[in-house]
Amino acid sequence: MINTRKFIATATLSILTITGFAQQKPILGTEKLKKYVEYFNSIDTEAVKNYIPNREAFKWLSDQAPLFECPDSVLEQNYYYRWWTYRKHLVKTPEGFIFTEFIEPVKHAGKYNSISCALGHHIYEGRWLKDNNYLKDYIKFWLYHADVGQTKQRFHQFSSWVDDAVYQNHLVKPDQGFLKEILPALDKDYGKWESERQLKNGLFWQNDVKDGMEESISGSRKDQNQRPTINSYMYGNAVALDKISVLLGETAMADKYKNKATAIKKLVQDSLWNTSASFFETRKAKGGSADVREAIGFTPWDFNLPDDNNNYAKAWDQLLDTAGFKAPWGLTTAERRNPTFRTRGTGHSCEWDGALWPFASSQTLKGLANLLTNYKKHGKMNANIFYQELHQYAASHVKNGKPYIGEYQDEKTGEWLKGDNPRSSFYNHSTFNDLIINDLIGVKPRQDNILQVYPLIPKNQWDWFILDNVSYHGKIVTILWDKTGTKYNRGKGLLVFVDGKEIYKGKDLKPLKAKMD
């Protein structure tokens, strides 16, 4: 265990421009990718084939996905597994490309088996693929096509942080023309959410099932409960629309959304923070807190909403407590000490009263990474904890000894609670690779020409790693750590290449900023 707070606080962020040697060819070839894809193909019956069938998976991923190698075989295998499964969900429709959530058709889906629940996760994950047109089609599908010809709402069938995700996608693959094209639709959609879900007190309400989190301890299918989820999402969306508007010179719109974000932030901190529990909790429709800690209480950090102080950071103590969220197989969706924890049945519905949901795990890990990266007050949290929980999350991707991602799991045994229901296989309802690229390795997308990297790898955890073939700002980025210099033979330390040119070299694995040209 290291004192990561001290490590982060004392790390020097240096801006360097170094004239280095040209990288003659990719340092990490595709041999490892090929090995993994062949293995994954060999254990798959491929009951459903979409745009990229298994036989084309290796070629497509070679062209599209960043390559990754590290000493942690669990993280490494799962990284390639999650790209392999994500690829399965790419569907070409008459209205453009989309990504599905379920591999099998489900009754509650819209056109082409589309579901908006995990849209934000899909965009965060897919922004690292080389061809961004898939996501642009997908975003426009939801803005312009998803509700056409439907008997009920599809886009607003679930809460969404789509505006935030659109902006985060832009930071990786800049395209102001695309933002300008869709900004009127994003603005209109935000107003629609306000008309449908904003109360007179300024907070947003949501049924837990419309958060994709039914049968929760604090939730309801009828009551207008004010949940940390939708309020955090709407804050994140307002912040993103402010930034997009500034980028496009839309001053009045920027001011409008800046004011909205400021108002929501204050309301969340004033109304959803339970001082006695030191946690963000659901506010009941009839008033007062739901008096239960749930993983959704970490969601405000996904959007850097809470103030940077020790009082709010204390919420994260619950990650370490076995009566809180810490369980043998991962992080629970509700505190284990609650008397009604895991009492709403198993497998017959989609219970969110404590079982492990990858949807929530990836949200919580993103929030923790933001705390460690963007805040000064970390409470008891450090890079070791982030790494351990990310590793556990990766290790949970297993069923009958083989790689698997499903809907939700028992927190003690790891049993997938939908059993062998074919709809659950390859469930595309969470992120993983974004957590590796954006958070563990720490590529921090920006609008300018500075490449920023903020690793959350604990000191002395790894002697080497490489993240290669990262498509960023129209360039190809490689980040390499070689403690001894003998793994990749490019010299000792942390090295960064852009389009084959070395732009940074340092002896320590620490945060850095470097000009890309």
For the regions a language model picked out, list residue spans one by one:
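Non-catalytic carbohydrate-binding regions of carbohydrate-active enzymes
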Residues: 248-284, 313-475
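Bacterial Sec-dependent N-terminal signal peptides
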Residues: 1-25
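Carbohydrate-binding surface patches
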Residues: 461-499
